[in-house]
Curated annotation (Swiss-Prot):
It comes from Acidithiobacillus ferrooxidans (strain ATCC 53993 / BNL-5-31). This is Ribosome maturation factor RimP. The keyword Cell membrane does not apply. The gene is rimP. HAMAP family: RimP. The lineage of its organism: Bacteria, Pseudomonadati, Pseudomonadota, Acidithiobacillia, Acidithiobacillales. Belongs to the RimP family.
Length: 153
């Protein structure tokens, strides 16, 4: 997986906003020789993303990408909702999904652990708080490599 550069990410976020949605995440994914720009959007915290929302963002992004040409080479544009296992990207996400199960991958080891799963307790003093059977854990956002919700069935 290749990170989307900050400037490109900001442009994608702006175009999603013009189409009435909020950018959750964007990434370039390579599978063999094919490259896809995957864009994950949400409408707002209470409204589900529809196929029409995805189409509107796709149209808006396609126009912008054609004009700005920020990606060199061929790629496929994919726009969708983030799904039940949505990524958690900022402090607002960690607070918003307080009470949910989450999986957190850290950049380095914390008490011998690089990956933790448990219940999100929210954000306290700009630190993310997670609770599991082993105890209570706190992390700075910068300590987290990636985080996602874990769907409960």
């Amino acid at each position: 997986m290749v990170n989307v550069e900050d400037r490109l990410y900001e442009g994608i976020a702006q175009q999603a906003g013009i189409a009435g949605c909020t950018l959750v995440d964007a990434r370039m994914v390579r599978t063999g020789r094919a490259v896809a720009l995957q864009v994950f959007i949400e409408k707002d915290e209470t409204t589900a993303v529809t196929i029409e929302d995805c189409a509107a963002v796709s149209r808006q992004l396609s126009l912008w990408l054609d004009v700005e040409n920020p990606i060199h080479g061929a790629y496929r544009l994919e726009v969708s909702s983030p799904g039940l296992d949505r990524p958690l990207k900022n402090l607002h996400d960690f607070e918003r999904f307080k009470g949910s199960q989450a999986e957190i991958h850290l950049h380095g080891l914390t008490q011998g652990r690089r990956r933790l799963q448990g219940e999100l307790l929210g954000v306290e003093d700009q630190k993310i708080v997670l609770k599991n059977a082993e105890g209570r854990w706190t992390f700075a956002l910068d300590d987290i490599h990636k985080a996602r919700l874990v769907p409960q069935w």
